[in-house]
From Swiss-Prot:
Organism listed in the record: Nocardia farcinica (strain IFM 10152)
Swiss-Prot/TrEMBL keywords: Endonuclease, Hydrolase, Metal-binding, Nuclease, tRNA processing, Zinc
SMART domains from the UniProt entry: Lactamase_B (SM00849)
Name the record gives this protein: Ribonuclease Z
Subunit structure: Homodimer.
EC number: 3.1.26.11
Length: 305
């Protein structure tokens, strides 16, 4: 299977700290590199993380608050400076078109890259040319319009060695069966369905600034990896509700209810000196893998089910 991992470029919320840069997350998915919410300093964090401008194939903004988009000018200019040969697709709330245009034209530079824009007018599937996954936008609840993203690989099949062997299908003939869909064996036709079982594709959800709402659960449902904001702790839930954010406990309860496999917490308020309580709060409610994100960490997607 191709490399699939999350490269964490920044984990702060509104105010960066000495240890935490503003947001930035690159999802590597084979030849795809989806850059989510590049905040200030993302370009420099890419250098530290070993991420090249040519790795970026798509940019996805959840909303137009500065900590989620002020790195966009540098990214757009860098992909042009480095003469990235492939088109780059950009997704963002259509209501922020004015901000997007300003960010992409923040200063003079030579435009060499085909930046294909996909403003999101409402929830639903998005155009993802040549992608090995579908992309869906789901509305969230924040003081400005915000969307979360869900990426889903199409379902496939898993060949069953025991059934293949029982029918005398070995070596190159297995590939022939997979390509053709059926194969003549000892005078009868064997189909792929007879020697395989369904294999669900991998899935990934990205949930940033939002209070609890139906969209959070919709995005999280059954995903292999959920990257979700945990700005506050449950003790400060009143602040989370007031400002349109989540607590670590809320994020963990969502993950538990949704049968998530790997929970990645991020977007932490600068009010907390350590994140030990975030982990403890999450593990109290969620028994799966909990990752408290750190800048420059690489988090592999869990193996296929």
């Amino acid at each position: 299977m191709s490399q699939r991992e999350l490269v964490v470029l920044g984990t702060a919320s509104q105010v960066p700290t000495r240890q935490r840069n503003h947001n930035g997350y690159l999802l590597r998915w084979g030849r795809e590199g989806v850059l989510f919410d590049p905040g200030e300093g993302t370009q420099r964090q890419m250098a530290f993380a070993g991420v090249a401008a040519t790795d970026i194939t798509r940019i996805a903004l959840t909303h137009f608050h500065g900590d989620h988009c002020l790195g966009l000018p540098g990214i757009v200019q860098r992909i042009n400076l480095d003469r990235v040969a492939h088109p780059v697709d950009a997704y963002y709330p259509a209501s922020g078109q004015e901000y997007f245009d300003r960010l992409c034209s923040a200063s003079s530079f030579y435009r060499r890259v085909d930046l294909r824009t996909h403003p999101i007018a409402g929830p639903g599937p998005l155009d993802a040319p040549d992608a090995p996954f579908t992309i869906e936008a789901v509305a969230l609840s924040h003081p400005v319009e915000a969307f979360g993203y869900r990426l889903t690989e199409p379902a496939g099949v898993r060949m069953l060695p025991d059934r293949l062997a029982a029918l005398g299908i070995h070596g190159p003939r297995i590939g022939e069966l997979q390509r053709a869909g059926s194969l003549l064996v000892d005078g009868r036709t064997v189909t792929v369905a007879e020697v395989s079982e369904p294999r669900p594709g991998q899935s990934f959800a990205f949930v940033m600034d939002t209070r609890l709402c139906p969209g959070v659960a919709e995005l999280a449902a059954g995903v292999d990896m959920l990257v979700i904001e945990a700005t506050f702790l449950d003790a400060d839930a009143h602040l989370a509700e007031e400002y349109g954010h989540l607590t670590a406990g809320q994020a963990a309860r969502v993950a538990a209810d949704a049968d998530v496999r790997t929970l990645v917490l991020t977007h932490f308020s600068q009010r907390y000196r350590t994140l030990d309580d975030h982990r403890a709060e999450a593990e109290k409610h969620f028994s799966g893998e909990v990752v408290v994100a750190e800048d420059l960490h690489r988090i592999p997607l869990p193996p296929r089910r």
